[in-house]
Amino acid sequence: MKKWLEKVDWIYVIVPLALLGTFWVIAAFAGQWPWQSNPYNSYALQTDSWLKGRLDLGQNYEWLELAIYQGKYFVSFPPFPSYVLIPFVVLFGTNTPDHLIALAVTIIGCIYAVKLYREASAEKQHSLFWVLMLYFASGYLFVGMNGYVWFIAQSMSFTLSLMALYYTLRNKGGLALAFWACAVGCRPMLALYGILLVYLLVKGYKKENPKGTVWQLVKEK
């Protein structure tokens, strides 16, 4: 047991627990618990419509931000989160546990934030401090615990961007660009982020293969 505990990389325990504890305190004061229903569930409604064979929502929801075209009502936000919700809509219908999904996305993000910092920095002993600052010294906390349509897309785009950058630094171009594309499907302005990823991928490949070409990079990665 002692040997097993010595092998545990505790930062991967401390950071998620710190976030979950903070979210619990915020929820206690705000009265917004992660298992509560989500009135702004545009993505669940969109996914449900897809599974029923249509692109529009079938009716108006006055409290949601919808696009109206030829008398039909459509979700006006980028659609990637709706793909993530497919298995949840199959199980729960439109009453998906969006706040819990947002929490899970945030936890995955903080794990990749640790991995990214350790990949990018030589001062690995400071990773706990800087990862906590990334989440606690920004406006992310409210976003990260909230499953409303605007915020869950932000959470997913942030986590997917961290994953894309991590795999870029690991010179895994396929994974990096796949996660980047998913991030763009949450927030289209992240398309500009692709320029940085391609630059870093080419730079990393040239470092490993000084005589390699960009075409070889495309074929290999």
Place the predicted regions along the sequence by residue.
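Perimembrane helix-loop-helix junctions
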Residues: 192-221
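Multi-pass, polyprenyl lipid-linked donor-dependent membrane glycosyltransferases
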Residues: 101-104, 132, 140-168, 182-193
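Membrane-interface transmembrane helices that cradle and orient dolichyl/undecaprenyl
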Residues: 121, 161-175, 207
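Short hydrophobic/aromatic helix or loop-helix immediately within or flanking a transmembrane segment
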Residues: 48, 64-93, 155
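Interfacial juxtamembrane loops and adjacent helix segments
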Residues: 40, 44, 52-77, 117, ...
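Membrane-helix interface segments
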Residues: 94-97, 122-129, 170-176
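Transmembrane-helix motifs of polytopic, lipid-linked glycan transferases
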Residues: 94-124, 163
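Start-transfer (signal-anchor) and selected internal transmembrane alpha helices
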Residues: 1-38, 128
